[in-house]
C-alpha cells in the first residue's frame, strides 16, 4: 500500500454539554476520563426557549491527539456501532454513562453522566490545506470516503457495523 494513502487518527474530541452546577461535574468527568484539562465552550447565539444567551458557558470539550488518542479510543469503543455514526473522514458516537468503560469506576462527586466522542481521520498530506503559505485543496481522490472510514475502524478496532434495520 502506498504510504501516502495510509489512514490515521488525527484527533479525538470528547464533548459534554451542561450548564451551571452540572458544568463543573462535566469538567471533572472529562478530566477523569482523559487526564487532560477540558476547555469550557461558550454559546454563540441567543436561544430564548432554552434560556441561552451569547457568552454563556454551555459545555466543555477536550481534544486528544497522537498515541494517547489511539489508546483512549480503544477504551471508549463498544463492540457495535451504527452505520449512520460514520461520515467521510470522521466517526461520532455517544458514551451514555462513563461507568460503561471497563477501566473507570464510579465517582460520587461526578455522578452518572455521559459524553460524545468525535473521531477525525486523516491521510499524509492533509496539512497542505492548513498551512499559511501556498495553501491548496485536497484532491477528491485523496479525501477519505465513508466506506474507507468504516473499513479503517473495522480493521483497527474490531468493531461490528450495524446497517439500517439492525438493532444494537
Ranges and model annotations:
Residues 1-168:
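Ribosome-associated RNA-binding proteins
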